[in-house]
């Protein structure tokens, strides 16, 4: 980190479950302005169910809460640590509890996130997965609850809705690679693994853990920058990454607000183009965007005020 900072302008974020952090580590992170990203799946019972520690005697949620307080005290800033949640089967029906826990712990936003088809989530989908329709129903209920919190004076943002609203209500991009066309894979970002392998996205790296190396562009020890980022492999991926050209996406009324995801399509449906009628990402995005338009069409001044406060 110290070497890299002397070479170019960089921002660092460390991803951690907080369990192994101590004051010395946190002070080092603060010194180098390295922000902290963690995971919080809800109240203690739900968080510990979703994210069990190998040492069953440890109380994951209690350690999380204690170390979060320590981090904020050292930084003197509540925004130095952000959290992401993942929806498992056990989370369904409990979005209100999850949101309340985020509010209780001093977070001002949440990203109501469905399960992704990669890594251990895909490996254990028989235990933790659910129909996308169930997530959509829970998302709507969660969004309604967040709107009610804001009406009561509690400023709290639903992150995915805020990204979509920025695309709907303004001419500005969000930088969120899942809502880009062409997709951001390999052109808006790349992943460098510990062994020098370069992937178009972190999801490609996770697929490689299970012996699917399709999204590996090369290796920094053997391949040139030009061959990796202007090679036929990336060109082929990007050709399948523009929703203006994809079947059904090209004619979809929500196309300007959505994006393409060739990595997810290959993981879920076996090819980078995908099949929209059975595509879960497509179903989810259509339903959420449609619901946001429903809320906007109510012309409720309070809801409109809340939405604009999220994207300003």
Tell me the role of every PLM-derived stretch.
Residues 1-46, 53-63, 70, 85-97:
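Canonical radical SAM enzyme core domain
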Residues 45-65, 69, 73-186, 191, ...:
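Radical SAM enzyme [4Fe-4S]-AdoMet core and its adjacent flexible, acidic
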Residues 208-312:
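Flexible mid-to-C-terminal extensions adjoining Fe-S/redox cofactors in radical SAM and related proteins
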Residues 8, 32-33, 77, 106, ...:
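Short loop/turn motifs at secondary-structure junctions
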Residues 30, 69, 103, 229-230, ...:
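Alpha-helix boundary recognition
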Residues 201:
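Short acidic/histidine-rich active-site segments
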């Amino acid at each position: 980190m110290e070497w890299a900072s002397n070479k170019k302008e960089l921002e660092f974020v460390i991803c951690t479950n907080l369990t192994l952090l101590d004051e010395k580590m946190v002070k080092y992170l603060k010194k180098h302005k390295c922000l902290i990203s963690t995971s919080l799946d809800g109240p203690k019972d739900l968080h510990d169910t979703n994210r069990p520690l190998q040492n069953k005697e440890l109380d994951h949620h209690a350690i999380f809460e204690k170390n979060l307080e320590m981090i904020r005290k050292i930084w003197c800033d509540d925004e130095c640590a952000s959290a992401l949640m993942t929806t498992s089967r056990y989370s369904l029906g409990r979005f209100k509890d999850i949101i309340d826990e985020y509010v209780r712990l001093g977070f001002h936003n949440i990203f109501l996130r469905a399960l992704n088809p990669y890594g251990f989530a895909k490996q254990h989908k028989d235990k933790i997965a659910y129909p996308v329709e169930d997530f959509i129903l829970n998302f709507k209920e969660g969004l309604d609850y967040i709107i009610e919190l804001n009406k009561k004076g509690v400023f709290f943002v639903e992150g995915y809705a805020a990204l979509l609203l920025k695309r709907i209500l303004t001419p500005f991009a969000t930088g969120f690679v899942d809502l880009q066309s062409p997709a951001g894979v390999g052109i808006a970002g790349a992943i460098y693994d510990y062994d020098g392998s370069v992937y178009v996205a972190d999801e490609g790296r996770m697929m490689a853990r299970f012996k699917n190396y399709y999204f590996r562009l090369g290796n920094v020890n053997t391949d040139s920058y030009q061959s990796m980022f202007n090679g036929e492999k990336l060109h082929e991926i990007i050709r399948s990454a523009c929703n203006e050209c994809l079947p059904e996406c090209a004619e979809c009324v929500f196309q300007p607000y959505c994006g393409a995801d060739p990595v997810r399509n290959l993981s879920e449906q076996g090819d980078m183009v995908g099949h929209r009628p059975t595509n879960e990402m497509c179903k989810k995005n259509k339903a959420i965007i449609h619901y946001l338009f429903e809320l906007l069409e109510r012309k409720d001044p309070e809801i409109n005020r809340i939405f604009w406060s999220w994207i300003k």
